[in-house]
Amino acid sequence: MTTPPPPSTTPLTYRDAGVDIDAGNALVERIKPLVKRTFRPEVMSGLGGFGALFNLAGKYKEPVLVSGTDGVGTKLKLAQQLNRHNTIGIDLVAMCVNDVLVQGAEPLFFLDYFATGKLDIDTATAVISGIALGCEQSGCALIGGETAEMPDMYPPGEYDLAGFCVAAVEKSQLLDGSQVREDDVLIGIASSGPHSNGYSLIRRIYERAGSPADLDIHGTRLIDTLMAPTALYVKPILKLLHTHSDAIHAMAHITGGGLTENIIRVIPPNLGLRIDANAWTQPPVFQWLQREGALADTEMWRTFNCGIGFVLVATPNQVAPLGQALDNQGLAHWQIGRVVTPVDNERVHIG
């Protein structure tokens, strides 16, 4: 029987095992001023507690809480390859707050999860600065989060992100699609680019094309277009709901599944959609992706937002005032289709 070797007399520390508590504490101190700028009057606690506190009293009569969680997909991989960490946090916030906005809810607070094999304070600070900026631009408080340093779990230089958002809406103003009627009009609001969806396919096309980062796409470098942060629709849409609530029957955030699979999620099961693909011109980056990837139209519609990041389902006689209100806020928009009775069980027709 083999005798086990005697235990080493060299003392070990958590840092020896790959976890640097001091680095984590230094990160917290670095991000505190960024986080504080996002706070709303309802925030009752600072960073560092076991739980973050938010006082909802007095703001709503019958509040309904709406929660959401998301990541940024493999756009994160591209950000890490390019060493661009300061805007991916905006994407993270947008993916969450735009989702809860669909039900007419105001984002209240946000929490993030940042996991890595070895904590790089500068990289983490850059990421969280983007998260804080996204929260500021959405009126949403960044009240907590988790930074997990997990040796051997991630390759050097890589990290993962997740976001969590809680929003609220008056029960009487909740948008759940139940008011949608045949002939309601679809108003598509412009995206800022691919947002945070379809990046596994985007990266494959980009690499197959020779990674042409500096390729001119309508006056912008291709890589800058691909890395443009996801548009934040919260403030303009909440303003629109305040002034035109009766005109909007439902809303949709165009994420994974594209135009084919997202708008239909808020449409009653007995109704369908007819979308006019000629109602707007797809931005050049989507034209490049389709050409370089030899993608069928159907693949484009169910993978990318194709230039439409958010959709309003509106009563027909209110389309003009809604359009004027969107113009006043500088949001490009188009009438892209209607709610219809399905033909031959085809609930979504794009043509």
UniProtKB/Swiss-Prot annotation:
GO terms for cellular component: cytosol. Pathway: Purine metabolism; IMP biosynthesis via de novo pathway; 5-amino-1-(5-phospho-D-ribosyl)imidazole from N(2)-formyl-N(1)-(5-phospho-D-ribosyl)glycinamide: step 2/2. It is an enzyme of class 6 (ligase). It catalyses: 2-formamido-N(1)-(5-O-phospho-beta-D-ribosyl)acetamidine + ATP = 5-amino-1-(5-phospho-beta-D-ribosyl)imidazole + ADP + phosphate + H(+). GO terms for biological process: 'de novo' IMP biosynthetic process; adenine biosynthetic process. GO terms for molecular function: ATP binding; phosphoribosylamine-glycine ligase activity; phosphoribosylformylglycinamidine cyclo-ligase activity. Disulfide bonds: none annotated. This is Phosphoribosylformylglycinamidine cyclo-ligase. It comes from Xylella fastidiosa (strain Temecula1 / ATCC 700964).
